[in-house]
From Swiss-Prot:
Requisite cofactors: Mg(2+)
Tissue expression as described in the entry: Up-regulated in malignant versus normal breast tissue. Isoform 2 shows a high level of expression in testis, ovary and brain.
Enzyme nomenclature, EC number: 2.7.11.1
Protein localization: Cytoplasm; Cell projection, Axon
Region (Disordered) location: 302-325, 441-490
Post-translational modification comment from the UniProt entry: Phosphorylation at Thr-479 regulates its catalytic activity.
Catalyzed reaction equations: L-seryl-[protein] + ATP = O-phospho-L-seryl-[protein] + ADP + H(+); L-threonyl-[protein] + ATP = O-phospho-L-threonyl-[protein] + ADP + H(+)
Designated gene of the protein: NEK3
Protein known as: Serine/threonine-protein kinase Nek3
SMART domains registered for this protein in UniProt: S_TKc
Length: 506
C-alpha cells in the first residue's frame, strides 16, 4: 500500500471496498479493490482466483489488471480506473430519456467483444450486470468485477454452482440445472433491455413472482421506435432454452452487430482486436444452402443458344423476308422443344418413380403404423444406453445403470419454499430493499419509480421444465458435458448458509 495514496472510496460490497488511488511515482489513477481474506485456506484461494483470472484477460473491452498484493489480512487488486462510471449510473442519469439506438448498439457491440474474449478463454463471468460494465470518457466500454468468474476445465463444459444477481439470473439457474456460457448471454440480454427501456426486464413485488417471471421468460416489448432487428436481438437472448440463445461469437458475426464491428467502431479499436471477429464474420457469411441446378442442362441450353446465334450471324446478309422466316422457324422450333421437354420430364419422372435401381430412395409418405403399434401401450421412461431386451417388434427396456452424472432437475418450487419467509436482503448489494412496513417490494435500482405487478401469466403450471433445455443446438458452444464440482446443488448450499435446513419440511 506504500506505493499508492488512497483518494476516496468509489464503491462498497460484500467483498469489501473499491478505492480510487493514485500511484505515488507516476501520479496515475487506478481503481483498487480491497477484499477481506477469509480465515480458511480454501476460501482464501477462492478469493485469489479473481486476481489470477483478471491478470489473464488482456483486452480493450475488459478492465486492465495492473498488480495484486496482500497486506494486513486483505487482498488488494489494482486495476484500470474507468473515469466514466458504471453503466447503471449512466442509465439512472437519463431520468427517463431513452438512449438513441446507435449509442445502445455501439456499447452493446463492445460488451459482446469483451464477453466473447472471456468465453474463448473458457471463463464464465457469472455476474454480468449494469454495475459491472464500466465506461471511459473516450467512449470505451469495459467488463469488470471477476469476483464470481469461473474457469471451466474444457471449452465444452457446464458449471453448476449458483452465482449471480437475481435480476440477471437465467431460468436454468433458478431451476438448479447446470449452465454454460449461455447464462452470460441471458445476463447480457438483461443489460441490453435496460439500455432500451431504462427498466429491468423482470420486475415483481416478491421473490416468488420475480422467479416465476424469469422462468417464463416473458418481457414487455421495447419502445416501438427501436428497429425490428434490435427487438429481434433482445428476443433471441431471452430464449428459455440455453441452446437456442446465440453465443457471443454469433452475436458479433450476424445482423446489426456485425455491421457495427466493421463500420461504427473507431478504426483504432478494430485494429486492436477486430481481426479475429472480422474473420469469423467472413466465414459465417453465405452459409445458407442454395438450390442446386443441373449443370449439364445449363451447358446444353447454352450450346443450343450459341449455335442459333452463329446461324443468325451467317444469314444476316440475307433478305428481310428470309430473316422473318428464320425468326418464325426459331419460335416454332423453340415451342416444339419446350413441349418435348415437358413430355419428356413427365415420362422421366414416372420412370424414376417405378425404377428399382434408384440412387435416392422414395420413402412412403404414410403414418408409421408399425412404430405406433409397438409404442401404443409403452410407458414413457428416461433411459440409458444399455438394452436388456432387444426382441424385434417390441419396446426395448433400458436399465438405469449409467456412468454418467444425473443432474437433479428440481422445479423452482423447492427454491420458492426456501425463500418463502426469507429476508429480501439476500438479493445482494445491487438492490434497494424496502424495509418491513413499507409494502415489502423487491426493488432493483431501475424500479424506483415503477410499481411492478404481482400478476404472472399462466401461474405456476406454466413453469414447466424443458427436457431438451440442455440439448445441443446449432451453436458449437453448446455441449452435453458437465463440469465436476464438489457442491453441484446450490439450493442445498443456500439452505445451509441461510440456516433453513428444516424450512421445506414445515
Amino acid at each position: 500500500m506504500d506505493d499508492y495514496m488512497v483518494l476516496r472510496m468509489i464503491g462498497e460490497g460484500s467483498f469489501g471496498r473499491a478505492l480510487l488511488v493514485q500511484h505515488e511515482s507516476s501520479n496515475q489513477m487506478f481503481a483498487m479493490k480491497e477484499i477481506r481474506l477469509p480465515k480458511s485456506f480454501s476460501n482464501t484461494q477462492n478469493s485469489r482466483k479473481e486476481a489470477v483470472l483478471l491478470a489473464k484477460m488482456k483486452h480493450p473491452n475488459i478492465v486492465a489488471f495492473k498488480e495484486s498484493f496482500e497486506a494486513e489480512g486483505h487482498l488488494y487488486i489494482v486495476m484500470e480506473y474507468c473515469d466514466g462510471g458504471d453503466l447503471m449510473q449512466k442509465i439512472k442519469q437519463q431520468k427517463g430519456k431513452l438512449f438513441p439506438e446507435d449509442m445502445i448498439l455501439n456499447w452493446f457491440t463492445q460488451m459482446c467483444l469483451g464477453v466473447n474474449h472471456i468465453h474463448k478463454k473458457r471463463v464464465l463471468h457469472r455476474d454480468i450486470k449494469s454495475k459491472n460494465i464500466f465506461l471511459t470518457q473516450n467512449g470505451k466500454v469495459k467488463l469488470g468485477d471477476f469476483g464470481s468468474a469461473r474457469l471451466l476445465s474444457n471449452p465444452m463444459a457446464f458449471a453448476c454452482t449458483y452465482v449471480g444477481t437475481p435480476y440477471y439470473v437465467p431460468p436454468e439457474i433458478w431451476e438448479n440445472l447446470p449452465y454454460n456460457n449461455k447464462s452470460d448471454i441471458w445476463s447480457l440480454g438483461c443489460i441490453l433491455y435496460e439500455l432500451c427501456t431504462l427498466k429491468h426486464p423482470f420486475q415483481a413485488n416478491s421473490w416468488k413472482n420475480l422467479i416465476l417471471k424469469v422462468c417464463q421468460g416473458c418481457i414487455s416489448p421495447l419502445p416501438s421506435h427501436y428497429s425490428y432487428e434490435l427487438q429481434f436481438l433482445v428476443k433471441q437472448m431471452f430464449k428459455r432454452n440455453p441452446s437456442h440463445r446465440p453465443s457471443a461469437t454469433t452475436l458479433l458475426s450476424r445482423g446489426i452487430v456485425a455491421r457495427l464491428v466493421q463500420k461504427c467502431l473507431p478504426p483504432e479499436i478494430i485494429m486492436e482486436y477486430g481481426e479475429e471477429v472480422l474473420e469469423e464474420i467472413k466465414n459465417s457469411k453465405h452459409n445458407t444452402p442454395r438450390k442446386k441446378t443441373n449443370p449439364s442442362r445449363i451447358r446444353i441450353a447454352l450450346g443450343n443458344e450459341a449455335s442459333t446465334v452463329q446461324e443468325e450471324e451467317q444469314d444476316r446478309k440475307g433478305s428481310h423476308t428470309d430473316l422473318e422466316s428464320i425468326n418464325e422457324n426459331l419460335v416454332e422450333s423453340a415451342l416444339r422443344r419446350v413441349n418435348r421437354e415437358e413430355k419428356g420430364n413427365k415420362s422421366v419422372h414416372l420412370r424414376k418413380a417405378s425404377s428399382p435401381n434408384l440412387h435416392r430412395r422414395q420413402w412412403e409418405k404414410n403414418v408409421p403404423n408399425t412404430a405406433l403399434t409397438a409404442l401404443e401401450n409403452a410407458s414413457i421412461l428416461t433411459s440409458s444406453l444399455t438394452a436388456e431386451d432387444d426382441r424385434g417388434g417390441s419396446v426395448i427396456k433400458y436399465s438405469k445403470n449409467t456412468t454418467r452424472k444425473q443432474w437433479l432437475k428440481e422445479t423452482p418450487d423447492t427454491l420458492l419454499n426456501i425463500l418463502k419467509n426469507a429476508d429480501l436482503s439476500l438479493a445482494f448489494q445491487t438492490y434497494t430493499i424496502y424495509r418491513p412496513g413499507s409494502e415489502g417490494f423487491l426493488k432493483g435500482p431501475l424500479s424506483e419509480e415503477t410499481e411492478a405487478s404481482d400478476s404472472v401469466d399462466g401461474g405456476h403450471d406454466s413453469v414447466i421444465l424443458d427436457p431438451e433445455r440442455l440439448e445441443p443446438g446449432l451453436d458449437e458452444e453448446d455441449t452435453d458435458f458437465e463440469e465436476e464440482d464438489d457442491n453441484p446443488d446450490w439450493v442445498s448450499e443456500l439452505k445451509k448458509r441461510a440456516g433453513w435446513q428444516g424450512l421445506c419440511d414445515r
